[in-house]
Structures are given as structure tokens and as C-alpha cells.
Amino acid sequence: PPWSSSRNEAWSRVPRGAAVTRSAPRVWSGTPYPLGVTFDGRGVNVALFSAHAERVEFCLFEPTGQREIERIELPEYTDEVFHGYLPDLLPGQLYGFRVHGPYQPEAGHRFNPAKLLIDPYAKLLSGPFRWSNAYFGYRIGSPREDLSIDRRDTARSMPKGVIVDDAFQWGAERRPARAWEDTVVYEAHTRGLTERHPELPH
């Protein structure tokens, strides 16, 4: 599983077939930037912008993406960014967001926590997108048209974000340890520099 053994002390998993838990796991304040979900080697910082939302839930899913196992409310709000830090959460974990706020179409507000949202800064997505009119925030065919609200949950069919580790694995390579006074930085256009190189295949 995409978490360390110590995670089980702070996070309660949901037994198969049981309801989603809204427990209070170990969540720190984190930072409002960078936006998105960022793994730092020890845990993840979660940051989502919204100027008008009232609260944001960070939702975790089992590896198949079909079952939601946890919802964690982001505890802080800074410069219109909801944020929190979750220690021990590791790359590979599937996630999404539920955003709570006013449903006032006349004012341009269509917050609907029944609709799982994809992280706009996600670096990797898991699962196919299966079209359904449940993705609309309003009820198709309703006499109130787009002023109505559709409360069908979309979590099962919506692709999920995947936490990734951005750190590059250098393997046996080491820094050249060359002094700056002995260094020349040369910016070049790849095609212009290599197009006529005799040892490169055409």
C-alpha cells in the first residue's frame, strides 16, 4: 500500500463495504504553495485555490480507485488557498477533492461536494474517464434547468490523481564538483547544434 507502516497509527482505514470515514488523522498546517499535491520525501503538502469555497476535503481512494476510504478536511486557509500537510503519505496514493460552498448559480457559484474534482495540478492520473451526465452539477431535464442541483456522487467514475515523487534518481552519477570560475554555460538550439553532426543518424 502507498503508505508507511507508521501511517496506520494516524489514519483509520475503512473496511470493505463500510462508509467513508471523516476521522481526524494527523494533519499539519502545511503551506499554501506550491499548489497541488507535493511529496517532499516524508509526506505531502496539499494546496488548492478557491476564493469562495467554505471548506475542502482531500479524498483518498483504494488502489483500484473505486472505493473512497478517507476524507480529510484541509485545516488552513491562506491567500485564498486551502492547505494542509499529511505526514507519512507516500507516492502511489490515489486522491481527489470535494469542495463545499454556496450553490447559487445566479451568482456564479456551483459548489457541489457530490462531484469529485480532479486536482488541476495533478502530475499523474489513474483510471479511464467514463462519460455520464452525472458529471453535470445540475439535473438534466429538470424544469429549473441549470438552476437545479444534481447530488449523484461521481467518485467511482472520475479519474483520480496519483501522488508522485518528483525527485530524479541519479543512480551512480555524482556532481562534477567543478568550480564556477572553470565553468562555461552555453545555451544552444538542439537542432542547430546537432543537425549536421556526422556521427548522428538522420
Language-model regions, residue ranges each:
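Low-acidity, Ser/Thr- and Arg-rich intrinsically disordered low-complexity segments
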Residues: 1-13
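The feature marks proteins involved in alpha-glucan
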Residues: 11-40, 68, 77-81, 89-185, ...
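Structural beta-strand segments of beta-rich domains
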Residues: 42-46
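Conserved, mostly hydrophobic/aromatic
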Residues: 48, 97, 188
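Short proline/glycine-enriched turn/loop motifs at strand-loop junctions of beta-rich domains
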Residues: 49-55
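Beta-strand signatures of extracellular beta-sandwich domains
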Residues: 57-59
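Surface-exposed loop/edge segments in extracytoplasmic proteins
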Residues: 65-72
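Phosphate-binding active sites in nucleotide-utilizing proteins
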Residues: 190-202
